[in-house]
Design a protein with these regions (language model features):
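Short, Lys/Arg-enriched alpha-helical microdomains
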Residues: 150
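Short hydrophobic alpha-helical segments that form membrane-spanning helices or hydrophobic packing faces
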Residues: 153-155
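Class I S-adenosyl-L-methionine
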Residues: 13-142, 158-162
Length: 162
């Protein structure tokens, strides 16, 4: 699918095109399965807060537009959908390698019910001073750590790897 409206800022493209190209845009409107959308827009300290929340919210301000009932489609799916608006953030916390964010969140959320202490000790030489510096308790669980704090952890990880 590729639709371009002349004189407009709207461009509708196949999702794979958007992911494989460096495109500049002011806003993205994307539809997701409701359960996935709930994870993307989840707040810290909630059960839906996860890796996908952090990865999506690193570069975007995201808000829910509305839910879409299965009755709106033909054939009718068995799931509900949600439309989300993604607006690129003007000021993001810069990290050298996005793979580090992916890897660190993967490590932390692979045992989401465990306290972060073991992962902090495993990843950071100076974990005690780091937890004080960014106000993370070793008894916290991954879903208690904000997106910005995860980004600071990644920056610290990259700095110690030099």
């Amino acid at each position: 699918i590729s639709i371009r409206l002349v004189g407009s800022e709207m461009c509708i493209r196949d999702r794979n095109w958007c992911l494989n190209k460096k495109a500049e845009f002011k806003k993205l409107i994307l539809m997701f399965q409701k359960e996935v959308a709930d994870r993307i827009i989840a707040k810290v300290n909630t059960k839906d807060y996860s890796r996908i929340t952090i990865l999506a919210n690193w570069k975007f301000n995201i808000k829910k537009i509305f839910d879409i009932s299965p009755e709106c489609f033909s054939p009718k799916p068995k799931i509900e959908s949600t439309l989300l608006e993604f607006i690129p953030k003007k000021n993001i916390i810069k990290i050298r390698n996005p793979k580090n964010l992916e890897n660190i969140t993967k490590i932390f959320f692979s045992q989401r019910r465990k306290m972060v202490k073991k992962n902090m000790i495993r990843l950071f030489k100076n974990f005690e001073s780091l937890t004080n510096k960014i106000d993370i308790k070793l008894t916290d669980r991954p879903q208690n750590i904000s997106v910005d704090k995860f980004l600071i952890l990644v920056k610290e990880y990259e700095n110690q790897s030099n």
